[in-house]
């Protein structure tokens, strides 16, 4: 895609393989452990958890700064002066990144941005579908591309089941934490990204395997699902046995293609270890 270059935050969890395939550029977000702030991706999630355990702290995250974006935009422009940069942003309701990008875009008339209203694998799905559209429609205008992106966003469903709610509570990203009630050890909630925000929508009880299946059932009951593909996601520590079971279960439900993504440092800092997520889509 020579005419357009898509830029995303590292919290989108677009894989290195997909970035290379579509020429997507990732801008690192930030993870803070105690007094130390590092770029997302510079240490893996397991090390984040290990350091937090060692120092007795919880991880915190922050978005990309205007300087982070300006550096990337200038580098792309120097390498591809005729390219138009499209920033498909991590949910604006959860971080400053989109605002930072708009500040960085001032005086750079080749940069356009929009809020995807998603994070992690939900944002990744929106981004990759947009990249495919651009590849198939190289002469599309920015308005046409963003109209397509909006149509994808309207069909994406994103949710996950954490096993340790302390990460969500400390991170302050959950918009309705009171919904969970007091007996946190007895439940595993379904956290969905709705209108760009993390919202607890349902409570599951039982083993993680039982809850993961109930969670998938809950997600596919939301409308007329496109069974050609489902994206599944996990944070470090989720057992291979459960992942294998959920892949078989997804196929049993009728999904033809099942892909897996291990989430990076930013989302791992919110959902904690051993979390399970899914991103099905509604039919167009």
Kindly give the residue locations of the regions a language model identified.
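Glycine-rich phosphate- or other oxyanion-binding loops that anchor nucleotides, phosphorylated ligands
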Residues: 55-92, 96-100, 146, 153
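Short beta-strand->loop
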Residues: 89-91, 114-117
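Non-transmembrane, interaction-prone segments in cytosolic or luminal domains
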Residues: 50-53, 58-59, 79, 204-210, ...
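A general structural signal for short secondary-structure boundary/capping elements
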Residues: 51-57, 73-76, 132-136, 278-279
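N-terminal glycine-rich anion-binding loop in soluble enzyme alpha/beta folds
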Residues: 5-70
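Short beta-strand/turn micro-motifs composed of small residues
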Residues: 8, 89, 234
């Amino acid at each position: 895609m020579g005419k357009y270059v898509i830029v995303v935050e590292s919290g989108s969890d677009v894989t290195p393989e997909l970035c290379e395939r579509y020429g997507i550029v990732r801008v690192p977000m930030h993870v803070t452990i105690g007094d130390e702030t590092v770029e997302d991706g510079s240490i893996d999630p397991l090390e984040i958890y290990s350091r937090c355990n060692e120092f007795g702290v919880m991880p915190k995250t922050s978005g990309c700064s205007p300087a982070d974006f300006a550096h990337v935009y200038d580098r792309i422009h120097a390498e591809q002066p005729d390219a138009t940069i499209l920033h498909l942003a991590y949910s604006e309701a959860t971080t400053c990144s989109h605002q930072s990008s708009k500040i960085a875009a001032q005086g750079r008339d080749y940069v356009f941005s929009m809020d995807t209203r998603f994070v992690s694998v939900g944002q990744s799905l929106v981004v990759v579908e947009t990249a495919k559209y651009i590849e198939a429609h190289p002469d599309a205008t920015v308005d046409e591309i963003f109209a397509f992106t909006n149509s994808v966003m309207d069909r994406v469903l994103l949710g996950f089941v954490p096993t340790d709610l302390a990460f969500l509570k400390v991170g302050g990203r959950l918009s309705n934490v009171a919904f969970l009630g007091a007996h946190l050890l007895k439940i595993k909630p379904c956290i969905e990204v709705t209108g760009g925000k993390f919202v607890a929508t349902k409570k599951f009880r039982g083993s993680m395997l039982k809850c993961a299946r109930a969670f998938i059932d809950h997600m596919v009951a939301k409308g007329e699902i496109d069974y050609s593909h489902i994206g599944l996601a996990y944070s470090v520590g989720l057992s291979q046995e459960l992942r294998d079971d959920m892949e078989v279960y997804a196929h049993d439900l009728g999904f033809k293609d099942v892909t897996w993504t291990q989430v990076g440092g930013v989302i791992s800092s919110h959902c904690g270890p051993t979390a399970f997520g899914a991103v099905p889509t509604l039919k167009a």
